[in-house]
A protein has these predicted regions:
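Multi-pass alpha-helical transmembrane bundle typical of ion/small-solute transporters
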Residues: 2-137
């Protein structure tokens, strides 16, 4: 398909990406579930929170990674002269990989002793970063 001379609104697209990232960060924190059993003592509370440590670790890692990507994406758009259809489609593939992060983060946090669950999170990170790197080409 031949690229037309249509001028895509760079600011509008950047705002869309910002909104998607904000939603992803919100979904990410919603995966941190409050324990459902009754908290009958301080010891019980501490024990239940201790069980959430792997989920918090995976959440913090994903949050920091997405924050760094958001900052870099902003810098990328500051230097972008023209927004093309191909660039938009590549960005949307990047966003697709980014939107899976809440699932893979929660999965790895809940199944932190399962190497497959942790590997799935890191594969998600790698794919996401490859697609993000492709935006610079």
């Amino acid at each position: 398909m031949k690229e037309t001379n249509y001028n895509y609104d760079k600011k509008r697209f950047e705002t869309f990406i910002d909104a998607v990232i904000a939603i992803i960060l919100t979904i990410l924190v919603l995966e941190l579930k409050i324990p459902e059993s009754e908290l009958t003592s301080d010891l019980n509370t501490r024990q239940q929170l201790t069980h959430l440590i792997p989920s918090f670790v995976s959440y913090i890692g994903s949050f920091l990674l997405i924050t760094g990507i958001w900052i870099d994406h902003h810098l990328l758009f500051l230097n972008l002269n023209k927004l093309t259809r191909k660039y938009i489609l590549l960005n949307m593939l990047f966003v697709l990989s980014l939107s899976v992060v809440p699932f893979t983060t929660a999965f790895a946090g809940h199944h932190y002793l399962d190497s497959f669950a942790v590997a799935l999170l890191f594969v998600n990170y790698v794919i996401m970063n490859i697609l993000f790197g492709a935006l610079y080409w």
